[in-house]
Amino acid sequence: MAETTSLAFPNMFNLTSNQVAVSEDIASVVERTRLLILTEPTELYNNPDFGVGLKRHMWKYNSTNERALIKDRIIEQLRLHERAVFPDRTQFTDGLLSSSDVPGEIEDPNSIKMTAVLQTTFGKEISLTLNQDAPVEGTLTINSSGWTVTQNL
């Protein structure tokens, strides 16, 4: 039996079996977290409390204040809407976990690179990487159990 289930996102309908598609366990948590992070407030369900709202940070410089605002907003949204994650155990790193830091590399003030590691209630970890290289373009990469989901912002 699955620990948690939800409607599959973004493909909510399984056309071959003429049913609503359902995700289970880690895929369910990944899809719900992805939906939560990529949604702007009032964009879905017309709820002002649902969604991290990353677009408001797109034209701002990569300062410690901006990173702190994004981190706080992600934790706040997980606390409100994601029951399968321990929000207080979320760990953030500035930069990408998979790349090594090159000494002397100048940080670009127009890019945000942040990785969050979430602990689920059933003992798995999810790694979320926000990589916004330019003010116009950005991607959210979600790594979990060997597969990666990338979404353009």
List each language-model region with its residue ranges.
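Immediate N-terminus of the mature polypeptide
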Residues: 1-76, 87-153
